[in-house]
């Protein structure tokens, strides 16, 4: 591609890869896809640890495929935030969790962004993007899309105990978390696929799904190793991007760099809160609330030990099952009556704002991919102390020793899926190479603390059911004295706090972009990633990120 592209897409991740691939289906549109990291071709082009869906080794701080941002979950709790720096973005690094946003999420976003984002409007997009190995072509699922989706078997010792424990507490079964059933316990849909010629199933990222089949198109260029520094804007119009390799002209620029990098690019380009930009000497192009109120899912890992060997090395996913439930309709008192049939039905009546995710691999294995006793993996970690920070949900420096001590623990990961609190992303320099400041402000709201307490206590109640009686041997970090006292439990939660790294809403539809992702006050500039969601969905956002790329591509193609 020698002449300027019609569209430059910045970021080849969960949304950017689908967007670029769909735009290039129109032969007359020249599309340039830029990625700061490498852009490997085919399954064999990716490092083995990034294909393995049983680990999250690529999310380890210091891995070349990871940006390793530094954030603060609370003012005194620093965390490393894993974000993908490779083709496929974070779909290449994450736990392969591929659960759709709930219909109520889409409908709530539509109240802000317009009816084109309602569940009914988005369902054709959700069906088009997937090949669902379990449900196939149906009114809710697709059978010919680029993203392969399956649900792990629930026959392993841990998965069977988890679902039985949830049933014992009265929670309903939820066999299809991408369907319309009541929230409950069930298998987690995952983007895992065994491609032809492969002996093992792999983490099926958006690069493999969307870009590989499109590489031969003469109107699509995929360029890796190019870091975009800022958007070039002249007289209120985006005309290209400045990169580490020089300026690149474009008819239109679409930022798909993710909910951290995208707001940073806007801010250093003069799009953001006027006072903040002026304080850094940045000329203001558009006074917009960029980065001022993002949301994410605070989470905590509840460590426990087993009575006997329960880890199945044949299990090809790390997180096969989850329980989703509502805090509003499940009181702590009900947890003391584990056999009460009234526990589940009311809790399923509302959209679930709490999640408990089952991890079936020990923490050490998740981080290192080392099997058996994990001693070799721990030695590897100790040789690289900066990489001991927890990859899955980040870790503070003060948690480093705890993570090493409990490397063989199993975990239930509890998360608050609809937090009241909001975080902020700011820049401290006009230099685009200076990382942004990411302040989560987690658990500042009592409503968030009370719901997280309920999630923690529910997770412990699951482990103490009859279903886990011949498996569970005890908690490894949480004591009954803390569990039974709100103030003590709050202190424990703050000391063990993590994040699901599901950041959304830093460039929201409504206040910063319109319903088609167009930035207010700047022509020729769009955003298409999870930063445009008004707030985080009540499930993980990976599947929604892909849908955003598909949806904005629809809008752009319809407009010519």
Pin down the residues of each PLM region:
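Internal hydrophobic alpha-helix adjacent to the cofactor/substrate pocket in enzyme cavities
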Residues: 166, 281, 460-463, 549-560
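Residue-level detector of alpha-helix initiation sites
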Residues: 14, 18, 153, 259-260, ...
């Amino acid at each position: 591609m020698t002449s300027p592209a019609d569209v430059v897409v910045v970021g080849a991740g969960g949304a950017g890869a689908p967007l670029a691939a769909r735009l290039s289906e129109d032969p007359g549109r020249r599309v340039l896809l830029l990625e700061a990291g490498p852009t490997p071709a085919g399954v064999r082009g990716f490092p083995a640890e990034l294909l393995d869906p049983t680990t999250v080794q690529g999310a380890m701080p210091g891995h070349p495929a990871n940006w390793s941002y530094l954030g603060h979950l609370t003012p005194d709790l620093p965390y490393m935030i894993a974000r993908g720096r490779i083709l496929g973005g974070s779909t290449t690094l994450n736990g392969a969790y591929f659960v759709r946003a709930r219909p109520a999420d889409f409908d709530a976003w539509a109240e802000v962004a317009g009816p084109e984002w309602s569940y009914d409007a988005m369902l054709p997009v959700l069906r088009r993007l997937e090949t669902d190995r379990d449900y196939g072509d149906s009114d809710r699922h697709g059978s010919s899309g680029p993203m392969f989706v399956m649900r792990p078997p629930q026959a392993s010792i841990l998965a069977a105990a988890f679902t039985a424990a949830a049933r014992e507490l009265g929670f309903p079964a939820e066999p299809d978390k991408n369907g319309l059933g009541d929230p409950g316990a069930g298998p987690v849909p995952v983007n895992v696929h065994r491609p032809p010629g492969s002996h093992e199933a792999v983490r099926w990222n958006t690069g493999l799904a969307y870009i590989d089949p499109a590489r031969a198109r003469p109107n699509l260029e995929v360029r890796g190793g190019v870091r975009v520094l800022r958007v070039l804007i002249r007289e209120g119009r985006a005309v290209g991007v400045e990169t580490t390799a020089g300026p690149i002209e474009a008819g239109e620029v679409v930022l798909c760099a993710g909910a951290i990098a995208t707001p940073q690019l806007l801010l250093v380009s003069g799009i953001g809160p006027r006072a903040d930009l002026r304080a850094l000497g940045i000329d203001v192009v558009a006074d917009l609330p960029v980065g001022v109120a993002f949301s994410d899912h605070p989470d905590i890992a509840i460590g426990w030990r087993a009575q006997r060997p329960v880890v199945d090395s044949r299990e090809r996913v790390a997180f096969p099952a989850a329980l989703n439930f509502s805090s509003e309709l499940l009181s702590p008192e009900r947890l003391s009556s584990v056999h009460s049939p009234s526990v589940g039905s009311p809790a399923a009546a509302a959209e679930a704002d709490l999640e408990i995710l089952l991890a079936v691999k020990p923490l050490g294995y998740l981080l290192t991919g080392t099997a058996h006793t994990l001693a070799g993996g721990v030695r590897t970690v100790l040789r690289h102390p900066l990489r001991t920070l927890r990859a899955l949900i980040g870790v503070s420096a003060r948690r480093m020793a705890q993570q090493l001590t409990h490397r063989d623990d199993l975990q239930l990961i509890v998360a608050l899926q609809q937090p009241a609190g909001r975080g902020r992303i700011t820049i401290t320099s006009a230099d685009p190479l200076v990382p942004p400041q990411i302040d989560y402000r987690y658990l500042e709201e009592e409503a968030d603390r009370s719901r997280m307490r309920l999630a923690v206590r529910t997770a412990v109640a699951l482990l103490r059911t009859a279903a886990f009686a011949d498996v569970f041997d005890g908690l490894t970090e949480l004591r009954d004295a803390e569990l039974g006292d709100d103030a003590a439990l709050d202190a424990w939660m703050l000391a063990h706090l993590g994040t699901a790294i599901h950041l959304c809403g830093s460039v929201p539809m409504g206040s910063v972009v319109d319903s088609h992702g167009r930035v207010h006050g700047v022509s020729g500039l769009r955003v298409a990633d999870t930063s445009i969601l008004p707030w985080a969905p009540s499930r993980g956002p990976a599947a929604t990120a892909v849908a955003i790329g598909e949806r904005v591509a629809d809008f752009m193609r319809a407009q010519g």
